[in-house]
Structures are given as C-alpha cells and as structure tokens.
Amino acid sequence: MYNYFLFMTNFGADTPFILLAKITVKEDKVSEYLELADKTDKAVEAVAPGMLHHTFDQDPENPLVFVWSEAYKNDEAFIAHLANPAVGKYLQEHPKLADDFTVEVYGTVGDKCLEVMKGTGVPFKVFQSKLGYSRL
C-alpha cells in the first residue's frame, strides 16, 4: 500500500514535508487564476515524481481564497518543483491576478531548501517537526 514506512527520529532534507500556500485572488480574476493554476498543475504532474500530492482547493466560506496543498518526498523534490518553468511562470503571473500569497511548511527542511524558499520572494513560515512519522 505504501512505498515505504518511515519512522522519523531524524528530521531534515531527506524527510517528507507538507506545504500549504494560501492565495487571495482578485475578484475579477478568478477564472484567469484558475486557468493559470490548471496549466501549472498539469505541468507539475507531468514532470515531478517527488511531488506526492498537489491540489488547488477553494475556501468554502470565501470564493476568492484558494490553497495549494502539496506533499513533497524530500527537499530535492521541492527544489526540482521550483525549477519547473511552469512554476516560474506561475510565480510571475501571480501578482497580476491575486492580492495575497503566504506559504506554511509543515516538516523540517534543510538549509539549501530554506535558501531556495527565500529566493521566491513569497512570505513563508516553517513549522519544524519535533516528533512523528510519515507514510508518504
């Protein structure tokens, strides 16, 4: 059922993590944003084997708020994700279509991954793992 079962006592660059990116789209730009998100999602699915989960979810109370929920196999998978040209285009187009973009990472990531995150210019917060396990 699972590719591997990992009890995590040491968290770091080789362990899975979850990323939630919350976006508030401009009122008159929702359909354009959904088109951009759809193109990006398809491009990610085609070339990112380390991306274990990738959905674009709409807030049930505010139709302008969306959340990318993503699960990564490890830091290398995230760094490869950001190197995808479609993701670069998405990050360039985002400010034209949305007012807000914040990222929360759940899990421990290495220094290289943190530097790559900082390089996006997107505000982010990392919640470092202290205990637990992953079946991703």
State the predicted function of each range:
Residues 37, 41:
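Short amphipathic alpha-helical/adjacent loop interface patches that line ligand
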Residues 1-7:
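Short, Lys/Arg-enriched N-terminal segments with co-localized hydrophobic residues
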Residues 16-24:
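Active-site-flanking beta-strand signature of metal-NTP-handling nucleotidyl enzymes
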